[in-house]
């Protein structure tokens, strides 16, 4: 019987083919294109470059390499490890802790295991299903004109069923399941990317709050010293009580900042503890914010191909592939399924006679089921799958456009923040010199208390603004790494 069916099976195998659309997703970034800064007026660019040059004349990069050389070395962001830009081993340890303990990341890992198990289930129908069956029974047949006849039978068989995947329905299902797994892997990488950037940003915020706290403490000590001088001069009759009250009010300003930074540091610590998967523990500090700013160098342009590394783009592309594969499943489901079923075993009236040559039973069947009328169910399912493919295609294109925008925004932000920080630093140096002169003139009786108060207020505000602009520059760099798909010690994602 098997020999007689072999030609039929061979014809079906030759005639069978995968039905469904072919899949192709265009790269979100053309080969060789770059993401670059917009043009800046020459006069403006020259001014900011002169500020930056003046600041780094006496500075050398943390790693010991001159800044100008590091610009060449780091021309491609793809070769830079995620945290190397900050040169802070404490931050690296915090990130490693978060990668081991963060609950959201552990959930993402468990979700991948779920989808991999589902993919294994999608692969199973490609193989025959084999079962062992046994039965013992009795039956009585009465024909009316003869005495009833009783039958006793014991049956043991091995049964096989196999759907021949001529139209590719099962293979499309496996492709969809594998694409789902890849999409979840990309989602996990996205969780890692967000986690690392969130830890880095939170840590930098803590460093900035530490710096604000130090500025406020130094300013408070300086103003208390000035207040003591003012009180002495009041006792000597050189100034009025109004002048003293003005100085007392000035002392309160940095005290308010101290209270604010203490509260904000506690809140930032709590937020970092959640990211680290820790309880309420103190966050260690490594380098300073100023050191991180000195070490930071970002090129003026980066390869647009780095956008291909972004987890959200990769996830959207794999979801598009999965939707396309499911459309192939829906199209193949409209074709006649071909099944091969068979069994082999033994059947006897008494169990003792099982497996005797004369009790052998077997069957082998080839079946085809042709859908003639289903009320349009299969056609509607294919239409639904086709609509989902279009949705996934548009979502992939939107993810690519959003990635391009994020990268452009982040690149502009990090360089504009650098220019802002350079201008703020120049202002602080000038105001510090102005305050020194104002104090000398006030002590010599050549300037009023208003001149001194104004110089103190201006310097304090400028120092806080400089600290915040340094944080803005560093967080913009973190945003750029996130926008480009990231990278961290060990080769990146």
Regions found by a protein language model. Give the residues of each.
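Terminal intrinsically disordered/low-complexity segments used for targeting and assembly
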Residues: 1-97, 154, 178, 262-308, ...
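Sec/SRP-type N-terminal targeting helices
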Residues: 106-107, 123-124, 165-192, 242, ...
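Transmembrane beta-strands of outer-membrane beta-barrel pores
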Residues: 114, 136-140, 164, 276, ...
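Transmembrane beta-strands of outer-membrane beta-barrel proteins
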Residues: 131-135, 161, 339-343
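Hydrophobic, lipid-facing positions within transmembrane beta-strands of outer-membrane proteins
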Residues: 154-162, 202, 302, 362-368
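Periplasmic alpha-helical coiled-coil/stalk elements that build and connect Gram-negative outer-membrane
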Residues: 170, 179, 186-302, 413, ...
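A short glycine-centered flexible hinge/capping loop motif at secondary-structure junctions
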Residues: 234-238, 442-446, 483-487
């Amino acid at each position: 019987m098997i020999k007689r069916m072999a030609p039929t099976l061979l014809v079906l195998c030759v005639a069978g083919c995968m039905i469904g659309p072919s899949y192709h997703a265009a790269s979100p970034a053309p080969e060789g294109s770059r993401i670059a800064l917009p043009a800046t007026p020459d006069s403006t660019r020259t001014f900011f470059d002169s500020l930056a040059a003046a600041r780094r004349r006496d500075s050398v990069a943390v790693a010991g390499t001159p800044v100008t050389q590091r610009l060449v070395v780091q021309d491609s962001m793809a070769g830079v490890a995620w945290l190397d830009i900050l040169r802070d081993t404490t931050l690296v340890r915090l990130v490693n802790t978060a990668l081991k303990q963060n609950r959201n990341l552990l959930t993402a890992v468990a979700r991948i295991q779920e989808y991999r198990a589902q993919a294994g289930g999608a692969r199973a129908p490609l193989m025959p299903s084999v079962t062992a069956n046994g039965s013992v029974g009795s039956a009585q047949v009465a024909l009316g004109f003869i005495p009833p006849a009783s039958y006793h039978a014991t049956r043991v068989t091995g049964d096989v069923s196999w759907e021949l995947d001529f139209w590719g329905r099962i293979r499309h299902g496996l492709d969809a399941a594998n694409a789902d797994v890849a999409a979840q892997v990309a989602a996990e990488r996205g969780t890692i990317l967000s986690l690392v950037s969130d830890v880095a940003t939170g840590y930098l915020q803590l460093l900035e709050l530490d710096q604000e706290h130090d500025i406020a403490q130094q300013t408070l000590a300086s103003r208390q010293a000035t207040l003591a001088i003012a009180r002495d001069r009041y006792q000597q009759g050189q100034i009025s009580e109004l002048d003293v009250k003005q100085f007392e009010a000035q002392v309160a300003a940095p005290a308010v900042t101290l209270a604010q930074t203490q509260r904000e540091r506690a809140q930032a610590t709590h937020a970092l503890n959640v990211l680290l998967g820790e309880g309420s523990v103190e966050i260690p500090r490594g380098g300073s914010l100023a050191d991180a700013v000195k070490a930071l160098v970002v090129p003026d342009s980066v390869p647009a191909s780095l956008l291909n590394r972004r987890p959200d783009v990769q996830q959207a592309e794999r979801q598009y592939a999965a939707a396309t594969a499911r459309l192939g499943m829906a199209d193949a489901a409209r074709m006649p399924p071909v099944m091969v079923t068979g069994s082999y075993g033994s059947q006897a009236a008494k169990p003792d006679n099982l497996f005797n040559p004369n009790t052998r039973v077997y069957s082998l069947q080839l079946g085809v089921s042709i859908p003639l009328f289903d009320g349009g169910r299969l056609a509607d399912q294919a239409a639904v799958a086709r609509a989902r493919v279009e949705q996934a295609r548009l979502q992939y294109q939107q993810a690519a456009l959003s990635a391009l925008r994020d990268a452009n925004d982040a690149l502009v932000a990090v360089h504009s923040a650098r220019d802002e920080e350079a201008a703020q630093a120049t202002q602080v140096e000038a105001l510090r010199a102005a305050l020194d002169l104002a104090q000398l003139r006030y002590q010599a009786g050549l300037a009023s208390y208003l001149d001194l108060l104004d110089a103190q207020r201006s310097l304090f505000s400028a120092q806080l603004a400089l600290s915040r602009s340094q944080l803005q520059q560093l967080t913009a760099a973190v945003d750029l790494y996130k926008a480009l798909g990231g990278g961290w010690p060990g080769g990146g994602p």
